[in-house]
Regions:
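ATP-dependent carboxylate/acyl-activation modules
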Residues: 1-196, 201-315, 349-350, 354-361, ...
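C-terminal hydrophobic structural anchor segments
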Residues: 311-349
Length: 387
């Protein structure tokens, strides 16, 4: 689960991490009042679950409360497009109004789960700010990474090594050591998968502050954190993702044109990989799970077809707990209830596969039945070429 910047900063503040003064506004009039309270120049920041807001025009500086009101009026309600939102963008419904700080230097600090090492990894860099992704790609040596063994936990030497890696003087080094320790505490105690401060800034008066913050939490651990569940913002999710969650379907929208319905996360990822290898482009990740009913399969099918970008559908099922005949029944029932115009490629293997194929064949509907995994991907790739 992702949270907004202002929500992440509230968590940081609760752990003693310094942040700029500021408040959230859902109207331009409220933004003006906040600017009057803060005094001096303020920064108006669009609140959406995506990075790159500054380059997209979602972060502006106002010199007066009246200007803050004017800028907030432009930003609130705008469709903000960044490199992380895709071309469709996200609608801005609120802004964070913060004091403008005199920044001397921008740094980077982040904690993620490194699945290859099966450990949390803390990263710091003297080159923070908007270009950190480019630096990570072109000059990875500028980013210091320290893995933390979960069995021994975060130690003082970890914090000191990372703080020195930021090239800070004595007092700032001490502030950084404390901040890194607190961020790791948040990461562990809140079951986070990402805690990022970018930029971490040094101000003119030698303070270290979190100028921007991003956090993501493990959905499967939210039952332990009722305080975090309250931060959930369904408006930031894709409507189809919200719809899928109602039926306990694991659905993530992507930007391709091949709709995928698969049982099992591993098979779903392998399916997306082979579609790409064959020259196609997956439109989603959709795992119906091992025990899906015919009704769930039907709902999954409807969700796939509701995506206007989808031109071809691939249904790839390996029948184990989820029998092939149950899947076939759900597909046929859904296809009969919607005006089916898209080509459907179906690959079934496993439990009751012959019965499943018979149901598809006798349905009277046109399905492209694949003989194996590769054949399914090739069929899909060839069909997309006509669009």
């Amino acid at each position: 689960m992702k949270v907004h910047e202002f929500q992440a900063k509230k968590i940081l503040k609760g752990y003693g991490v310094p942040i700029p003064r500021g408040e959230v506004a859902k109207t331009a009039a409220k933004a003006k009042k906040i600017a009057e309270k803060l005094g001096g120049k303020v920064v108006i920041k669009a609140q959406i679950h995506a990075g790159g807001r500054g380059k997209g025009g979602g972060v502006k500086v106002a010199s007066t409360p009246d200007e803050a009101q004017q800028l907030a009026k432009k930003i609130i309600g705008m469709n903000l497009v960044t490199h992380q939102t895709g071309p469709e963008g996200k609608k801005v419904k609120q802004v964070l109004v913060e004091e403008e700080l005199e920044v001397v230097k921008e740094l980077y600090l982040g904690i993620v789960v490194d699945r290859a090492q099966a450990q949390p990894v803390i990263m710091v860099s003297e080159a923070g700010g908007m270009e950190i992704e480019e630096i990570a790609a072109k000059s990875p040596e500028k980013i210091l990474k320290v893995a933390v063994d979960p069995t021994t936990g975060f130690m003082g030497f970890h914090a000191r090594k990372l703080a020195f890696g930021l090239g800070l003087e004595k007092e700032l080094n001490k502030q950084a050591t404390t901040m890194i320790s607190q961020l790791y505490k948040i990461f562990v105690e809140k079951d986070a998968t990402l805690v990022e401060v970018n930029p971490l800034v040094i101000t003119k008066d030698d303070r270290l502050l979190a100028l921007d913050a991003k956090m993501t939490f493990d959905d499967d651990a939210l039952y332990r954190h009722p305080d975090l569940k309250e931060l959930y913002d369904p408006d930031e999710l894709e409507p189809l993702e919200v719809e899928a969650s109602k039926y306990k379907l694991n659905y993530i929208k992507l930007d391709g044109n091949v709709g995928c319905m698969v049982n099992g996360a591993g098979l779903a990822m392998a399916t997306m990989d082979i579609i790409k290898l064959a020259g196609g482009n997956p439109a989603n990740f959709l795992d119906v799970g091992g025990g899906a009913s015919a009704e769930q399969v039907e709902n999954a099918f409807r969700i796939l077809l509701a995506d206007k970008n989808v031109k071809v559908v691939l249904i790839n099922i390996f029948g184990g707990i989820l029998r092939c005949d149950r899947v076939a029944t759900g597909i046929v029932e859904a296809a009969k209830k919607v005006e089916l115009k898209l080509p459907i490629v179906v690959r079934l293997e496993g439990t009751n596969v012959e019965e499943g194929r018979r149901i598809l064949k006798e349905s009277g509907l046109k399905f492209e039945v694949a003989v194996d995994f590769r054949d399914a991907a090739d069929k899909v790739a060839n069909l997309t070429k006509s669009f």
